[in-house]
Amino acid sequence: MYKRQPDTLQKIADSIEKTDPDIVYGETALVDSERRFISMRRLQAPERLSVKSFRMGMLVCHQAFIVRREIAPEYDLRYRFSADFDWCIRCMQMAKTITHTHEVLIDYLNEGVTTANREASLRERYEIMCRYYGTLPTFLRHLWFAVRFAFARFSGRE
């Protein structure tokens, strides 16, 4: 069971002071509208995050992804629902050092804008992935995503 830690901000500050990273990232807890814990996010942040990591989907929520201002580009506003995915990739392309805090950085409301517009979001994300990772590799990975999603739905971890 996840419990909010009162020293999360201090741990983030310590991590930044120790490694001087361009990006700091962590984990995401899903909560309901009354901020009650539901579960940890199904996709966990990888130990070592890189541009290549996002070939497997958005492994880190942008809210749990803290970027040094000097390397942070503007959001690409042609994307209505997946600009965060594109933004995270572009940030990682610019980053020299990326540090995992191993902390839950955010409580994420389970029903956000992207969730409410899932089909449009998935189309945009597919387009972004084709641009960065190639059309054929993206298509093949999406076959795997379909299997992964079906398993998650079947096991109740959608």
Language model: regions and residue ranges:
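Conserved donor NDP-sugar-binding/catalytic core segment of glycosyltransferases
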Residues: 6-38
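Membrane-proximal basic amphipathic "stem/tether" segments
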Residues: 130-158
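Conserved small/polar residues in nucleotide/adenosyl-binding loops
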Residues: 1-5
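Secondary-structure boundary motif
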Residues: 14-18, 93, 97, 131
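Acidic catalytic patch
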Residues: 30, 102, 142-144
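Short, hydrophobic secondary-structure boundary micro-motifs
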Residues: 24, 39-41, 100-101, 137-141
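Alpha-helical elements of Rossmann-like donor-binding domains used by nucleotide-donor carbohydrate transfer enzymes
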Residues: 7-15, 86-90, 124-128
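Conserved nucleotide-sugar donor-binding catalytic segment
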Residues: 40-120, 124
